[in-house]
Amino acid sequence: MTQSLADMRREYTRDGLSEANAPSDPFSLFRQWFDDAVKTERLPVEPNAMTLATVDADGYPHCRILLLKGLDERGFTFFTNYESAKGRQLAANPRAAMTFFWPALERQVRIEGSVEKVTPEESDAYYQVRPLGSRLGAWASPQSRVIADRAELERLLAETERRFADQPPSCPEHWGGYRLLPQRIEFWQGRPSRLHDRLDYRRQDGGWSRERLAP
C-alpha cells in the first residue's frame, strides 16, 4: 500500500438532513434521494447498485453487490438465480439487508426486512426486457456452483444458444425476483467532523415511526 489506511479520510461538506425536510413516508425520501443520485452520480457508477446481505442456515453472513430493479409501496425488488448461494440462503432464512451508498452526495441508505419471491408473472415481465445475452446466461450459468474453467461456462452458453436458436428463451423456473419488505429504513447524510445526520424509520401500527440516531 502506498498510503496508511489510518490516514485515508475526507471531510463531508454537503447539506444536512433534518426532520423538518424529511417526509413521514420513507419511500418518498428514498425516491427523492435515488433521483438525486441518478442526476449526480456519473457513469460507470450505477446508482441502483446496492450491497445485499443474507445469512445462511449456519448463521454466517454473506454480502454481494446487486442492482435494484423495482420499487413500489410493497418494497425493493431484485432478481437472481433461485438456486444460487443467495437463493439458498434466503430459502433458509428469508430476511435480508440492503445498503445503498452514493458517495458524490455523501449519502447512504440502509434497509432491513423480510424477503419474499415475486410472482412468476413479475419475473417473466422483467426477464423479457433483459438483453438476449442476459436471458441466455440465466439458462447457461449454474450460478454459485463450481466449474472447471472459463471454457466450461462458454460451452454451456454455446449449448444454450443452440437450444434457443429457433425460439426466444423463456424465463427459467430457477430464476426470478425477490422483494424485500422493509421493516426499517435508515437515511444517513455525511456531515462535518463525523457528526453525521441519521434518520431511522421503522414500521409501526400500519405506518412508520421516525427517530434521529446519534452518529
Curated annotation (Swiss-Prot):
Note on how the cofactor is bound: Binds 1 FMN per subunit.
Family membership: Belongs to the pyridoxamine 5'-phosphate oxidase family.
Could you tell me the EC number(s) of this protein? 1.4.3.5
Q: Assembly state and interactors?
A: Homodimer.
The source's superkingdom equals Bacteria
User: Can you name this protein?
Assistant: Pyridoxine/pyridoxamine 5'-phosphate oxidase
Q: Under which pathway is this protein filed?
A: Cofactor metabolism; pyridoxal 5'-phosphate salvage; pyridoxal 5'-phosphate from pyridoxamine 5'-phosphate: step 1/1; Cofactor metabolism; pyridoxal 5'-phosphate salvage; pyridoxal 5'-phosphate from pyridoxine 5'-phosphate: step 1/1
What NCBIfam families does UniProt report for this protein, alphabetically?
pdxH (TIGR00558), PRK05679.1 (NF004231)
Q: Could you say which enzyme class this protein belongs to?
A: oxidoreductase
The function of this protein is: Catalyzes the oxidation of either pyridoxine 5'-phosphate (PNP) or pyridoxamine 5'-phosphate (PMP) into pyridoxal 5'-phosphate (PLP).
Indicate which residues the UniProt annotation says bind substrate: R9, R10, E11, Y12, K69, Y126, R130, S134, R194, L195, H196
> What keywords appear on the UniProt entry?
Flavoprotein, FMN, Oxidoreductase, Pyridoxine biosynthesis
**UniProt lineage:** Bacteria, Pseudomonadati, Pseudomonadota, Gammaproteobacteria, Pseudomonadales
Among PANTHER family, the record links this protein to: PYRIDOXINE-5'-PHOSPHATE OXIDASE, PYRIDOXINE-5-PHOSPHATE OXIDASE
Q: Which GO terms describe its molecular function?
A: FMN binding; pyridoxamine phosphate oxidase activity
**GO term, biological process aspect, one:** pyridoxine biosynthetic process
| Catalyzed reactions per annotation | pyridoxamine 5'-phosphate + O2 + H2O = pyridoxal 5'-phosphate + H2O2 + NH4(+); pyridoxine 5'-phosphate + O2 = pyridoxal 5'-phosphate + H2O2
State which gene encodes it.
pdxH
Q: Where does FMN bind?
A: R64, I65, L66, L67, L68, K69, F79, T80, K86, Q108, Q143, S144, W188, R198
Fetch the Gene3D superfamilies from UniProt: Electron Transport, Fmn-binding Protein, Chain A (2.30.110.10)
